[in-house]
């Protein structure tokens, strides 16, 4: 859907599942189950389609601005049938923040569409683009209920080559369940470093381990 906030989908909190190292929600009215997990440098997404569709689209939006953050330049391109490479430079939360990425797809898209919105630095440079906001649309045809597509996106603050190295080191496959289990195991190990006595009230245990979890992700 198109709205003032940009491309979006409705959801209900009733469909959410949130655990250490895992998040899931159903996008309505598309009936798409979204699941997220991660390694240290790789974000892993799985989209499961809950009904048949002639065509579905996964959108990589590098042109998106939210609150005080804005794109000042970006790029994204298919470096292979199952790999997307690019970068996003932004301003706002951090000045001239540079993030490079490589995304591995569990299956190639039938078609990829790329749009680039030019950015103009000032009124004195009308017509001179100093950067672009890029959006990639990945189209998949004849998707059946229960089918999934997994994306593994590695990040680097140094270069696209660095992002590729991180992907190769931490995401050699596209098995979402294996990444989720690994994340759960790591969180269990970290959170178990401090054990409360068995007579600690459940409410205090919840408060303590929630605070410990938040401290670990900072």
Describe the residue ranges of each PLM region.
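Beta-sandwich/jelly-roll carbohydrate-recognition scaffolds of carbohydrate-active enzymes
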Residues: 1-218
């Amino acid at each position: 859907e198109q709205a003032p906030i940009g491309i979006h989908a409705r959801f209900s909190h009733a469909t959410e599942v949130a655990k250490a190292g895992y998040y899931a929600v159903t996008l309505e009215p598309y009936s798409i189950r979204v699941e997220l997990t991660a390694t240290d440098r790789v974000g892993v997404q799985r989209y499961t389609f809950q009904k048949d569709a002639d065509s579905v689209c996964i959108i990589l939006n590098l042109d998106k601005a939210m609150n005080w953050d804005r794109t000042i330049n970006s790029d994204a391109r298919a470096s292979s049938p199952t790999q997307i490479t690019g970068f996003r430079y932004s301003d706002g939360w951090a000045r001239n923040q540079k993030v490079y990425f490589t995304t591995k797809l569990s299956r190639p898209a039938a078609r990829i569409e790329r749009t680039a919105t030019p950015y103009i630095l000032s009124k004195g440079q009308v017509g001179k683009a100093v950067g672009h906001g890029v959006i990639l649309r990945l189209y998949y045809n004849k998707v059946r209920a229960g089918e999934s597509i997994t994306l593994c996106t590695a990040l680097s603050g140094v270069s696209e080559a660095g992002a590729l190295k991180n992907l190769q080191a931490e995401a050699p496959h596209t098995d979402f369940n294996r990444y989720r289990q690994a994340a759960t195991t790591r969180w269990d190990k970290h959170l178990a470093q401090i054990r409360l006595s068995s007579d600690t009230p459940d409410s205090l245990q919840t408060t303590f381990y929630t605070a410990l979890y938040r401290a670990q992700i900072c």
